A protein has these predicted regions:
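Non-catalytic terminal/linker segments enriched in charged/polar, low-complexity residues
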Residues: 1-83, 332, 336-337, 352-353, ...
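Nucleotide-state-sensitive switch-loop elements of NTP-binding domains
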Residues: 40-94, 99, 103-195, 202-209, ...
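Short hinge/gating elements
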Residues: 41-46, 94, 99, 157, ...
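Long, well-ordered amphipathic alpha-helical subdomains in the mid-to-C-terminal portions
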Residues: 56-57, 272, 283-361
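Alpha-helical scaffold elements adjacent to nucleotide-binding pockets in ATP/GTP-utilizing enzyme cores
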Residues: 136, 173, 198, 202, ...
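Well-ordered beta-strand positions
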Residues: 184, 205, 230-231, 269
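Flexible active-site lid/hinge loop adjacent to a nucleotide/diphosphate
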Residues: 212-243
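Canonical P-loop GTPase G-domain recognition
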Residues: 231, 237-294
């Protein structure tokens, strides 16, 4: 191998030592300057109770975290914030993709803040994709007015987790938002699968947004979704679509007659509106507050809140048991083998599951 640097052409050249490390321009900037002081649970609680949305956002991030250390702090913060929660009106908003939920929530939020004052938090239940583990986080960009309003707090869905886990975290986020002084909570869900049922289990009023002019409006709606709806609103009631919307509203009203009377005693209403033009928004929120007054008067409001608290207690038990089962080292070693026996036809799914459960409980006994 040739080394041209050793040739006579370069013989008179020398290599200088060079300069040493450059000193920091700002003498007050020390090593580790980017280290942030870790907040304690007391710091989070203090910031939340003062209405500091930056601290609130950080606390919600702790709630969404799967790190055990974060979870421990989050639970302490939630427990200390619990006495300051429960004073909001919680509204669930659901509808199929394309129904205009985000635009509608933007208009709903601006209207209710203008008419009722106070503060509004917008949350989401959007379980991750089973394939990519990603979820829809673009709603905030479509809420152009609320996203810059000083009295609003918009929190997109966690980016990973099962429906039960995401819903529980949303429920806990509601507690933190209420403690921070948000007296109106919107919980948005994509409106497919079981997410609307989870949403219904944490709100006072469940609003279903529908579209007209898509064929048989009633055919594509699950009976269960209509049964849990306290109000149905048909969006895009403008221009040439007005007659179609009113015709669809009549179809929905007729269909509601075949459903049993809701436990609340309230008769669900069907209204038309335009989220784009903002028409009909006032009537929707008049309906929401009529419902709240109605159920507070007959005692159903408090009853439903208590039932929801019990429901989430049992859901938390189920989730923790599930997590503990799958994190058990013995079970993790046996899962692949159990899968193989099922796929080979040596055992049924139920037998394999029972064997794993028996092993798990025996392992607990030690």
């Amino acid at each position: 191998m040739e080394h041209p640097e050793n040739s006579s052409e370069f013989a008179g050249l020398t290599v200088n030592k060079g300069i040493g490390p450059v000193s920091i321009v700002n003498p007050y900037l020390k090593k580790g300057r980017f280290a942030r002081r870790k907040l304690t649970a007391a710091d989070y609680v203090e910031g939340i109770l003062k209405g500091n949305v930056t601290i609130l956002g950080q606390a919600v991030t702790l709630v969404e975290s799967t790190v055990p250390e974060h979870q421990a702090i989050a639970q302490e913060v939630i427990e200390k914030c619990l006495p300051y929660s429960g004073n909001s009106v919680r509204v669930g908003i659901s509808g199929v993709p394309g129904a205009g939920k985000s635009t509608s929530i933007d208009e709903f939020g601006i209207h209710v803040l203008k008419e009722k004052g106070g503060k509004l938090a917008v949350l989401a239940i959007d379980p991750s994709s089973e394939r990519s583990k990603g979820s829809i986080l673009g709603d905030k960009t479509r809420m152009e007015k609320l996203s810059v309003h000083p009295d609003s707090f918009i929190r997109p869905s966690p980016s990973a987790g099962s429906l039960g886990g995401v819903a529980r975290k949303t429920r806990e986020t509601i507690i933190l938002c209420e403690a921070a002084g948000f007296d109106k909570i919107f919980v948005e869900t994509v409106g497919v699968g079981q997410s609307e049922t989870a949403c219904h289990s944490m709100v006072d009023f469940f609003l279903l947004i529908q579209l007209a002019g898509t064929g048989d409006e009633l055919q594509g709606i699950k009976r269960g979704i209509m049964e849990i709806s306290d109000g149905i609103c048909i969006n895009k009631c403008d221009g040439e679509n007005v007659d179609k919307c009113h015709l669809a509203a009549t179809s929905f009203r007729n269909a509601l007659h075949f459903f049993p009377q809701p436990e609340s005693g309230w008769t669900p209403k069907v209204l038309c509106y335009s989220g784009f033009y903002g028409t009909g928004i006032k009537e929707i929120w008049d309906m929401v507050y009529q419902y709240i007054d109605f159920v507070k008067h007959n005692g159903y409001f408090e009853y439903r809140r208590n039932e929801q608290s019990k429901y989430w207690m049992y859901e938390s038990i189920n989730e923790h048991l599930r997590a503990h089962f799958y994190h058990n080292e013995t079970i993790r070693q046996l899962l692949k083998k159990a899968e193989a026996t099922v796929l080979a036809g040596e055992k049924t799914s139920f037998t394999a599951a029972q064997d794993l459960l028996d092993t798990y409980f025996n392992d607990l006994k030690g």
